[in-house]
Amino acid sequence: MSGELPPQVQNQLAQLQQLQQQAQALVAQKSQIELLKKEAEAAIKELDKSPDDVVVYKNVGELMLRSDKATLMTELKERVDLLDLRLKTVAKQEERIQSRFNQLQDQLRQSLGQMPPRGG
């Protein structure tokens, strides 16, 4: 008797592994977004402490450009809003992947439970 798993079980295992990889990628993406959000919020906090006529600069690629406080505050707040939206999107993706993972895990358990025992 062959020790190989049936094609259906192999397929389910491959799908589980793929979902695990997707979940790990989402965790990394979520961490990166959270970090960017914290940086933007910290910049907003520092700008709030500054007088309105303060000279500020912002990074644009390899350049630092002069800007005014109000414009920079608006840009930073929009960035935080966008990052919040991205975090919500990632959270929904995580939920879908987790749900699919649990469903597939149950199917796999059922498939393995129906396999004939290996005898010797």
Swiss-Prot record:
Pfam families: Prefoldin_2. Molecular chaperone capable of stabilizing a range of proteins. Seems to fulfill an ATP-independent, HSP70-like function in archaeal de novo protein folding. This is Prefoldin subunit beta. The keyword Cytoplasm applies. Gene3D superfamilies: 1.10.287.370. The keyword Cell inner membrane does not apply. Heterohexamer of two alpha and four beta subunits. Its main location: cytoplasm. NCBIfam families: gimC_beta. It comes from the Archaea.
